[in-house]
Every structure is written in structure tokens, then in C-alpha cells.
Amino acid sequence: MSRHPSDRKVYVGDLGNNARKNDLEYVFGAYGSLRSVWIARNPPGFAFVEFESARDAADAVRGLDGRTVCGRRARVELSTGKYARSGGGGGGGGGGGGGGGLGGRDRGGGGRGDDKCYECGGRGHFARHCRERKARQRRRSNSFSRSRSTSRRRRTRSKSGTRSRSRSAGSVGRRSGRSNGRDENGSASRYSDHERNGSGAVDSPPPPKRRYEDEDDDRVRGSPRSRSRSRSASPAVRRGSPPRRRGDSSASRSVSRD
């Protein structure tokens, strides 16, 4: 049995959020028998794999470091944690905490001087206490909040624009409906408001003048029409002599022949 169980424990970093235990068992099981596999969920992105033999763990580190694991190019190396009293394995590497990386509880605070942070590469603290990581999280949260506020403003503007357009369309429709109704009824569109009397009934229009009234007016005023008629009359009528008849002319002609 090895003096430090961390010699058999392998840290797997730079994993995606969708890494599964079965996938890690399949990949690392090709190098030897496994004791346990633990995947971090809060925060995600790393895992610990413990082998039965330290030699198998070293072979897995040499063969898988920088290779694609669970769809991501992973970083594989031996865990740097010391032997823990709980027997859960070494802490170290990638924010496993002082207690254990294979499902053990986090017991420490900021870590020891020989602990390595896999976020910034520095020593003396764990990844979950890394300042650079917290700064990145704050930037992500700020950008997400700004994007949400921008999308909300766009939605409110679009809703107000559609409401105003619908209101204007409704008012135009009501106006056109009123005008059409008046045209169909006929009475409302023909007569204006000042042509209605106090009771609301429409005053009937005056009847048109008759033709003979126009002629009488022309005669009285001496219009050109009456003058032309008087000029066209025969001279006998103007002198006051009675008009000749056809019978009289024929009788005079017969007497002259005799």
C-alpha cells in the first residue's frame, strides 16, 4: 500500500459542465482498476479519479494529459493533497478542499502553502477562493443583467408601438364606419346640420319653378325672347288689320275672273 493515497488519485481539470461519471470510468478504466470517481458540481469543471494502483494512476496521467475527455481537452495530473484522516483521499488540486476530493467534505478555508489553484495557477489557495475566478463571475453576472434589461426595454417598446398602431387603426375604422353608415341611410349625408329644424326633422327643399312662370317673367321684363316673337309676327298683325282667310282670297279670285 502506498504511503500517500494521493499517489493513486488523479485530478482531471478543464472538464465541461456535462461530464458524466460513466464516461470517466470508461476512459480511465482502460489504464487499470478504479476505486472511485467523483465529479464536482458546485462549481463544475473538474473531477477526481482514484486507482487501485499508483502505477496505473501514473500511466493514466501520461496517457490522458492534454487529450479530449468528455468532449473537452482535459488537464490530467496527480492530486497534490496530503493524506486525510477521514480516508477520503487527498484534497488539493482544483478546489477539492482540505477534506477530500472524492466526495469528502470541505474542511478548510483558504488552503495551505503547498496547495495549487487550478484557476490562476498560483499556490496557497484553492480554486473556489481564487480572486480571478470571482472577478470573472461578477463580470458574467453584470453582462447577463445588462442583456436582460436591454431585452426588457425592447419588449416594452415593441408592445407600446403595437398598442398605438392598433388604437390608430381602430379610430380610423370607426370613422370610416360612421361615414359609410351615413351614405347608406342617405338623409344624413344629403342635408347639413343647419338644414334641420329644432325637432330634428329635415326641412324639405323648395319645389322647382315651373316653366310657364319663367315665360311670364320674361314677358314682363321684356326679355329678348319676347322681342324676337314680336318681330317675327306679320306686318298686318302689327298694323291692327284682321288677317286674311283662305276662303276670302279664293272668292276674290273667282270674281275677278268673271
Curated annotation (Swiss-Prot):
Domain RRM: 8-81
Key words of the record: Metal-binding, mRNA processing, mRNA splicing, Nucleus, RNA-binding, Zinc, Zinc-finger
Posttranslational mods: Highly phosphorylated. May be phosphorylated by the serine/threonine-protein kinase Doa.
TM stretches of this protein: none
Compositional bias of kind Gly residues: 86-103
Primary location group: nucleus
Biased composition (Basic and acidic residues): 104-113, 180-197, 210-221
GO terms under biological process: mRNA cis splicing, via spliceosome; mRNA splicing, via spliceosome; regulation of alternative mRNA splicing, via spliceosome; regulation of gene expression; regulation of mRNA 3'-end processing; regulation of transcriptional start site selection at RNA polymerase II promoter; RNA splicing
Annotated localization: Nucleus
GO cellular component: catalytic step 2 spliceosome; nuclear speck; nucleus; precatalytic spliceosome
Regions of compositional bias (Low complexity) in chain numbering: 231-240, 249-258
Ranges annotated as biased composition (Basic residues): 130-141, 149-166
Gene3D superfamilies for the chain: 3.30.70.330, Zinc finger, CCHC-type (4.10.60.10)
Zinc finger (CCHC-type): 116-132
A GO molecular function held by the record: zinc ion binding
Gene null: resulting phenotype: Conditional RNAi-mediated knockdown in female fat body results in altered expression and differential exon usage of genes involved in metabolism of lipids and carbohydrates, the immune response and the response to xenobiotics.
Ranges where the record places region Disordered: 81-113, 130-258
InterPro entries on file: Nucleotide-bd_a/b_plait_sf, RBD_domain_sf, RRM_dom, Znf_CCHC, Znf_CCHC_sf
SUPFAM superfamilies: Retrovirus zinc finger-like domains, RNA-binding domain, RBD
Assembly and interaction partners: Interacts (via Arg/Ser-rich region) with Alsin2/CG7564, Rbp1 and Doa (via N-terminus).
PANTHER family with a match to the protein in the record: RIBONUCLEOPROTEIN RB97D, SPLICING FACTOR, ARGININE_SERINE-RICH 1-RELATED
Functional description taken from the UniProt entry: Serine/arginine-rich splicing factor (SR protein) involved in differential exon usage during RNA transcript processing, probably by binding exonic splicing enhancer elements and recruiting components of the splicing machinery. Binds RNA stem-loop structures with consensus sequence 5'-CCGUNUNKNW-3'. Regulator of genes involved in lipid and carbohydrate metabolism, the immune response and the response to xenobiotics.
Protein's name according to its UniProt entry: Serine/arginine-rich splicing factor x16
Species of provenance: Drosophila melanogaster
